[in-house]
C-alpha cells in the first residue's frame, strides 16, 4: 500500500510528456514529480514490455513510487508502423516521412497507444490507453508534440496539434491510461 499524499515520480526526458501528464494528474488530485535520468528502453515490438522493463530498471535507481510511459503511433496501412519505434521514426523521417509513405492511400486509420507502468518496488502494474483516429493529409497545428500535427482523433476534424492541452486530454491515449492508473491508485492508497 502507498501512503496518501506521496508524490509519484515520472521518469521521462520529454518535457512535453511530463507537462501533459502533470495536467492530467491535476484532475485526479495526484501530485507528480519529474525524475531526471536516462530511461532505459529495451528493443521490443511490445509497448507494454518496454514500459514494464523501463519501470523496473528505474525503480532500481530511484527507489521510490514511479510511473513510466511508453507510447506509439500505429498506422493501419503501414502494418502498424511506426508502433514502438515512434520516437526513432519522428527523429529520422519525421512527420513529412509518414505523410510521404501514405501518399495515394485512402485508408489513413491509425491509433495512438500508451502503456503507463507504475511500480513502488512491491508491485508493478501497466495501464493501457488507446485513441483511434486517422492521419491527416498535411501537417496542421503548432501545439502538442511528436506526431500530434498529423493525428486526428475519432470524432474530431482537428489534429491534436490544433487543440489546447485540455481539449487534447479529452481524447488522449495518455489521459485514458492515466485515468485507469488513478482508479487503481485510489484503491491502493492507504485510507486515513
Curated annotation (Swiss-Prot):
<keyword id="KW-0479">Metal-binding</keyword>
<dbReference type="GO" id="GO:0009143">
    <property type="term" value="P:nucleoside triphosphate catabolic process"/>
</dbReference>
<feature type="binding site">
    <location>
        <position position="70"/>
    </location>
    <ligand>
        <name>Mg(2+)</name>
    </ligand>
</feature>
<feature type="binding site">
    <location>
        <position position="71"/>
    </location>
    <ligand>
        <name>substrate</name>
    </ligand>
</feature>
<feature type="binding site">
    <location>
        <position position="41"/>
    </location>
    <ligand>
        <name>Mg(2+)</name>
    </ligand>
</feature>
<dbReference type="GO" id="GO:0009146">
    <property type="term" value="P:purine nucleoside triphosphate catabolic process"/>
</dbReference>
<comment type="similarity">
    <text>Belongs to the HAM1 NTPase family.</text>
</comment>
<keyword id="KW-0378">Hydrolase</keyword>
<dbReference type="GO" id="GO:0046872">
    <property type="term" value="F:metal ion binding"/>
</dbReference>
<dbReference type="GO" id="GO:0017111">
    <property type="term" value="F:ribonucleoside triphosphate phosphatase activity"/>
</dbReference>
<protein>
    <recommendedName>
        <fullName>dITP/XTP pyrophosphatase</fullName>
        <ecNumber>3.6.1.66</ecNumber>
    </recommendedName>
</protein>
<dbReference type="GO" id="GO:0047429">
    <property type="term" value="F:nucleoside triphosphate diphosphatase activity"/>
</dbReference>
<dbReference type="InterPro" id="IPR002637">
    <property type="entry name" value="RdgB/HAM1"/>
</dbReference>
<comment type="subunit">
    <text>Homodimer.</text>
</comment>
<dbReference type="GO" id="GO:0035870">
    <property type="term" value="F:dITP diphosphatase activity"/>
</dbReference>
<dbReference type="GO" id="GO:0036220">
    <property type="term" value="F:ITP diphosphatase activity"/>
</dbReference>
<keyword id="KW-0460">Magnesium</keyword>
<keyword id="KW-0546">Nucleotide metabolism</keyword>
<keyword id="KW-0547">Nucleotide-binding</keyword>
<dbReference type="InterPro" id="IPR020922">
    <property type="entry name" value="dITP/XTP_pyrophosphatase"/>
</dbReference>
<dbReference type="Pfam" id="PF01725">
    <property type="entry name" value="Ham1p_like"/>
</dbReference>
<feature type="binding site">
    <location>
        <begin position="12"/>
        <end position="17"/>
    </location>
    <ligand>
        <name>substrate</name>
    </ligand>
</feature>
<dbReference type="GO" id="GO:0000166">
    <property type="term" value="F:nucleotide binding"/>
</dbReference>
<dbReference type="GO" id="GO:0005737">
    <property type="term" value="C:cytoplasm"/>
</dbReference>
<dbReference type="GO" id="GO:0036222">
    <property type="term" value="F:XTP diphosphatase activity"/>
</dbReference>
<comment type="function">
    <text>Pyrophosphatase that catalyzes the hydrolysis of nucleoside triphosphates to their monophosphate derivatives, with a high preference for the non-canonical purine nucleotides XTP (xanthosine triphosphate), dITP (deoxyinosine triphosphate) and ITP. Seems to function as a house-cleaning enzyme that removes non-canonical purine nucleotides from the nucleotide pool, thus preventing their incorporation into DNA/RNA and avoiding chromosomal lesions.</text>
</comment>
<feature type="binding site">
    <location>
        <begin position="173"/>
        <end position="174"/>
    </location>
    <ligand>
        <name>substrate</name>
    </ligand>
</feature>
<dbReference type="InterPro" id="IPR029001">
    <property type="entry name" value="ITPase-like_fam"/>
</dbReference>
<feature type="binding site">
    <location>
        <position position="168"/>
    </location>
    <ligand>
        <name>substrate</name>
    </ligand>
</feature>
<feature type="active site" description="Proton acceptor">
    <location>
        <position position="70"/>
    </location>
</feature>
<feature type="binding site">
    <location>
        <begin position="145"/>
        <end position="148"/>
    </location>
    <ligand>
        <name>substrate</name>
    </ligand>
</feature>
<dbReference type="GO" id="GO:0009117">
    <property type="term" value="P:nucleotide metabolic process"/>
</dbReference>
Amino acid at each position: 500500500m502507498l501512503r496518501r499524499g506521496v508524490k509519484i515520480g515520472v521518469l521521462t526526458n520529454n518535457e512535453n510528456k511530463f507537462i501533459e501528464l502533470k495536467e492530467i494528474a491535476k484532475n485526479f488530485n495526484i501530485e507528480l514529480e519529474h525524475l531526471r535520468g536516462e530511461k532505459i528502453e529495451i528493443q521490443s515490438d511490445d509497448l507494454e514490455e518496454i514500459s514494464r522493463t523501463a519501470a523496473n530498471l528505474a525503480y532500481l535507481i530511484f527507489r521510490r513510487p514511479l510511473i513510466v510511459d511508453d507510447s506509439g503511433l500505429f498506422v493501419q496501412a503501414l502494418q502498424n508502423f511506426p508502433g514502438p519505434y515512434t520516437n526513432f521514426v519522428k527523429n529520422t523521417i519525421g512527420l513529412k516521412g509518414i505523410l510521404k509513405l501514405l501518399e495515394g492511400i485512402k485508408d489513413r486509420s491509425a491509433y495512438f497507444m500508451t502503456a503507463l507502468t507504475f511500480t513502488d518496488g512491491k508491485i508493478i502494474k501497466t495501464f493501457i490507453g488507446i485513441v483511434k483516429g486517422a492521419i491527416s493529409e498535411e501537417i496542421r497545428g503548432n501545439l502538442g508534440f511528436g506526431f500530434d500535427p498529423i493525428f486526428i482523433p475519432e470524432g474530431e476534424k482537428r489534429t491534436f496539434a490544433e487543440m489546447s492541452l485540455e481539449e487534447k486530454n479529452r481524447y488522449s491515449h495518455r489521459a485514458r491510461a492515466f485515468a485507469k492508473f488513478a482508479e487503481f491508485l485510489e484503491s491502493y492508497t492507504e485510507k486515513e
